Amino acid sequence: DFKCPSEWYAYDQHCYRIIN
């Protein structure tokens, strides 16, 4: 599986940071 750091989510094999 494609994994991202904590607080990030994966989409299309890229990581995006969750902005609050």
From Swiss-Prot:
Distribution of this protein across tissues and organs: Expressed by the venom gland.
Top-level division of the source organism's lineage: Eukaryota
Further remarks about this protein from its record: Negative results: does not agglutinate fixed platelets.
Subcellular location: Secreted
UniProt keyword list: Disulfide bond, Hemostasis impairing toxin, Platelet aggregation activating toxin, Secreted, Toxin
Protein name, as recorded: Snaclec ophioluxin subunit alpha
Main location class: secreted
Cysteines joined through disulfide linkages: C4-C15
Family note: Belongs to the snaclec family.
Domain C-type lectin, chain residue ranges per copy: 11-20
A GO term for molecular function: toxin activity
Binding partners and assembly: Heterodimer of subunits alpha and beta; disulfide-linked.
Record's function text: Binds to the platelet and collagen receptor glycoprotein VI (GP6) and activates platelet aggregation.
Any single GO CC term annotated in Swiss-Prot or TrEMBL for this entry: extracellular region
